[in-house]
Amino acid sequence: MSDGSTDRTDAIAGEFSGQGVKLLRVPFGGKPAALNAALEVVGGEILLITDVRQVLEQQSVRRLIAGFADPQVGVISGELLFMDSATNEEANIGSYRKFENWIRRQLTLVDSMLGATGCFYAIRRKLARPLPPETLLDDVYIPMGAFFAGYRLVAEPEARVYDYPTSLATEFPRKVRTLAGNYQLLKLYPQLLGPKNRMWTDFVSYKLGRLMMPYLLLALLISSFWLPPVWREAFVGAQLAGYGMATIDGWLPEGLALKKVTALARTFGVMMLAALCATSVLFVPAQRLWMPTQMPVKKA
């Protein structure tokens, strides 16, 4: 599937036409439109959805689809990992990704994940439903359709896919879109907050909790000024120190011991800022939050 590609993507894909690879090219219209076009022409029992940028580990596809031997499983998600990081900033984003993977594995043990890894997952063809044109989180909307049809969404940690490490500048708009998509999900799937959601507690704590976190932190800072003096100084001072470290991180050189602490504070702060900016989806068209991720250029 080529969604208005302007580089050599189409030509490269065409080189594999003799090996059964079929290229479907559509005018640029966003990922939902591209996926909907693909759903109209693909067949088979299992759909494998991948992005072109990531690198799949050998045997990862076999490991991924093996789980469909369980008839209760509707979606299986691979595990995204980042390649070696060059900076503390990239390392912290990689650690955040590992934490996300851990959460998904734990949710699988309970029942189901709340979505899938968009660059590498598989779904039973009969469960894949078309996307509304304004959808921000296709990798949540499509899997959750299977979830509400009574199937499980599970993680397969042995089906690994690799991506290049990213900077906070690259990650920020993507995180804004992801968190804004959580607001949008409440409109697309209002049953998420109803009794039909067998993962209700997990959705509220995992998805909605992240949206509320910056507001709770702001309330914590303000309320700290009403504490007794000895506690007020400690609580306010600790919070301001954390925000201060996040602020100065950009001016500190790599290799400085303090950088490991300030980079972590900055990463956390940027994620909180992204959660605040995500509320923009309530006031602007959702597709204005789409920004293509720039692929880092590998050095020879």
Spans of features found by a protein language model:
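Short aromatic/hydrophobic "clamp" motif used to bind/position activated sugar donors
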Residues: 47
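Short, conserved alpha-helix that lines the donor NDP-sugar binding/gating region
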Residues: 10-14, 31-40, 143-144
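Membrane-embedded multi-pass helical conduit in multi-pass membrane proteins
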Residues: 210-286
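A conserved acidic beta->alpha catalytic loop
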Residues: 2-11, 27-29, 54
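Long helical/loop segments within the catalytic core of UDP-sugar-dependent glycosyltransferases
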Residues: 27-28, 32-34, 38-40, 44, ...
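Active-site acidic Asp-centered loop
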Residues: 3, 50-52, 132, 157
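Membrane-proximal intrinsically disordered regions of secretory-pathway and membrane-system proteins
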Residues: 288-300
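Catalytic donor/gating beta->alpha subdomain of glycosyltransferases that bind UDP-sugars
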Residues: 68-100, 133-138, 142-203, 267, ...
